[in-house]
Amino acid sequence: MSEVKIDSNSFHKRLSLIQKNLTSIQDKQSCLLLLVGASDDENTYKKTTVLQTWLLGYEFVHTGIYITQDKCVFITSEGKAKYLTNLTSKPTENSSSVEIWPRYKDAEKNKETFKKLIEELKKMSSREKPIGHIAKDQYRGKFIDEWNEVSADAGLSFSDCALLLSESMEIKDSEEFANTKIASKSSTVLMDAFANEMMVVVDEEKKTSNSDLSEKIEDKIDSNKWYTKSATGKKLLQSMKEFDPSLVDWCYSPIIQSGGEYDLKPSAQSTTKALVGDGVILASLGLRYKSYCSNVARTFFIDPTPAMETNYDFLLKLQNHVTSTLLRDGTVASQVYQGALDFIKSEKPDLVQHFTKNCGWLMGIEFRDSTFVLNSKNERKLQNGQIISLTLGFSNLTNDKASNPKLKQYSLILTDTFKVSESEPILLTTYPKARSETSFYFKDDEPTAVKSENGGDKKLKSEKNIKTEKNLAANEANSKILKSKLRHESSAADDSNNTEKIRQEIQSKLHEKRQHEGLARFSKADATDASDFKPVFKKYESYVRESQIPSNVRDLKIHVDYKNQTIILPICGRPVPFHINSFKNGSQNEEGDFTYLRLNFNSPGAGGNVSRRAELPYEDSPENSFLRSVTLRSRDHQRMVDVYKAIQDLKKDAVKREQEKKQMADVVSQANLVELKGSRVKKLDQVFIRPQPDTKKIGGVLQIHENGLRYQSSIRMDQKVDILFSNIKHLFFQSCKDELIVIIHCHLKNPIMIGKKKTHDVQFYREASDMAFDETGGRKRRYRYGDEDELQQEQEERRRKALLDKEFKAFAELISDSSSGMVDLDIPFRELGFSGVPFRSSVLCMPTRDCLIQLIDPPYLVVTLEEIEIAHLERVQFGLKNFDLVFVFKDFNKSVVHINTIPMELLEDVKSWLTDVDIPISEGQMNLNWATIMKTVQSDPYQFFADGGWSFLTGEGDSEEEDEEDEESEFEVSDPDPSDEDVESEAGSEDDYSSDASGSDASGGESEEEEEGEDWDEMERKAAREDKRLGAS
């Protein structure tokens, strides 16, 4: 028990529920005494042990718990007591006090402890108010023997408190419900595994007993191979990121029955008789996760008769009636059973005598709560939050058309796990129950039609299945079982509707959760408007004092001072400096013998949408005067060309520096790597890094040190890359199966510099094959004599890939282990992947436990699932072959992520995956303008959620976008504020200088002058207005 950690808050919360119920019945029981002896493997559901697990999360053998209305006392060994010490501190003032009375190896000291307990019990109890205990629970062991010896003559009075404990534990909190949900999912997957195994046995006519098949299913959860190799095992392991295989156990051994002998009691067992592949096969199984139970049972048919099918259809109808009208908050348990019985009497009275004696029970840590069974005697009410195993069945039915006398008798069962709610209950075990999913046909005759209850003809097999049957009959190698197992095929409309209904219910809750989270995260104070916009004014200064001006300006020519980033212009016989940040753009043209150079400068309101610019060159003020443009002319054409080019180059360099400064703003300098020495350093040789520090592709060594990783080039010792564990956000290993490289990938919290590149992703890889080209001829052919088909070469490549995977995965796990829990290894699930276009080309995007990734082709895609606010599906409409996926992040300042052109046939798979990882989904027929949407959300997030939040995404696109019905995605990003395009094009921008110098020369000067500068008449009019204004003042 070295890793035992007891949740103190959960313990005190649950203890208070017991004490509250104890207070309400204080006229019956005064206190509780619950003693546990040695562990009993034959009966794991003793209520006293269940109570320990519920309160503490663990079973404490040889331990007693004494509970009164205001305190709780533990009597246990000194070794176990140390795990309980944190319970003695009260989390709140109203919490009960907790005392720990240790037991010793000395029996005499223990007697003194028990005598002290007996004195407490005598004070609290009397014959009218006895001590509560669980009468059915009988334990053995030294602890129990010592207690019995001391208490035998004490004259204590006891009564059963099973009902009190049941009422305390019946309502499941969010943590308990999450565990039950995982257990139910596990049972559903294992039922699918059973169906696959059973189909193979029946189809291939193997001789297997019911008990042998039960053991085979039971052993699966203990097999690592099953989790990693089989489709069902992978499905269970990958569908839930919080799933831990070590916490899964069986509630009971799977019950498999066939051959005419059936028992619908929960205590039934699989017989040792052979599995009979005819008539009816019953399968019941239940898994528990973190001790919380689930239950599911199904009836499988092999060539059923019409009467059998009719009875089963009625069983489905009965379950639907019970769940839709009876199984809800406030209903008395006996009314559930009586309502089911009344429905049978009204619809099929001949089945009343075959109906089970109860129709389910309350479940939790205890598989079957005997104090809450859905029968005719139980007067307790269903409550919101209870977990119910609803079991409906008919036993001892007769099949008159059975050719085998042993198969004349059959039974039907249908069990599912539900959570009670105020409306219809929530189905947790979603294994298909439709007859088309559980019936298999072996006979070659064409399916006949039978009359359904409403009088219409009802075919036993759908047209799709009939066509499939004809195709299978033509191919003797194919299985005779007609149930389709293809990924994208739905063989039963009713089951598909049920699955869609479940997904919609889950999505509805996820959307509601996001809405509540949004209202909780933001307030009215988070709203921003235009008045909150505070532009940053660039601070620059060419020269502090006049003496710093270069001496060569005395010639009164135009000079460019590269050192001080300044243009010096001769104005009125004096050199006037202009910092390069004040320069906006310019133009040059020739007229006659003169060359004109026009320079435009930044000034407030000189064009462009100011609200879109984070930095401005000047602050507008009535005390400031601004020079908007100046024109100079010279007869020296070459001089003017050189000056203009020098000014342009200086501007480009200035803009480039500003951009680099902004890009480096989030680069955080890492702490120093603590190096290990000698053999303590774990290494992975012959790996390459992306991005490369140098232009040449050079291999190196990846090393694990005390607090991080170091990549060291094998040629240049000064070329190394350090990555600290504390800066690794995600660590991935990607196999080279079906790929050309094997990868260990680090996605970082803060970017680092590799060479001159800033990067959030660092990747270490090795090529899986050294075959650069196919040598089908030449000298090497003689070395492959006899292997012209390259079979041996392919086998060798597969072997090499397997070794690479093993080596890299082991090293990745070593990285995770060395990080002391800071880094957790994540592996992509290729079978859940889907193709799409996140950037420029179509790639395979693969989910992992925590992310959605694409690591093969740069730029890499790493989307953290926990950071996603909502996923929106665009262009989802009939007739299109593709759709788009948009991720909106909880941080609304982050840009949305688009994955375009996903094949439409993967739509359901993408929806299922997003639902499984608890991401709300919306969909629409059009592409949305996300820049405008996010600007609206950022401006007032509280009002956005107050107005309904993301609910608007479930509607169709705006009318202005309805003309976008192209099948292909839009890859061009539209301007979020198109109204200022004309102003921008006329006024120009500093962004013009961010391109290469080769793309801008003097040839475009004339057109620039026409677009950028104002004509002389306009300037004179403005000057006159300004003079008039100043004169009037």
Curated annotation (Swiss-Prot):
GO terms for cellular component: FACT complex. SMART domains: FACT-Spt16_Nlob (SM01285), Rtt106 (SM01287), SPT16 (SM01286). Keywords: Chromosome, Coiled coil, DNA damage, DNA repair, DNA replication, Nucleus, Transcription, Transcription regulation. It is found in: Nucleus; Chromosome. Residues 1019-1033 have a biased composition (Basic and acidic residues). PANTHER family: CDC68 RELATED (PTHR13980), FACT COMPLEX SUBUNIT SPT16 (PTHR13980:SF15). This is FACT complex subunit SPT16.
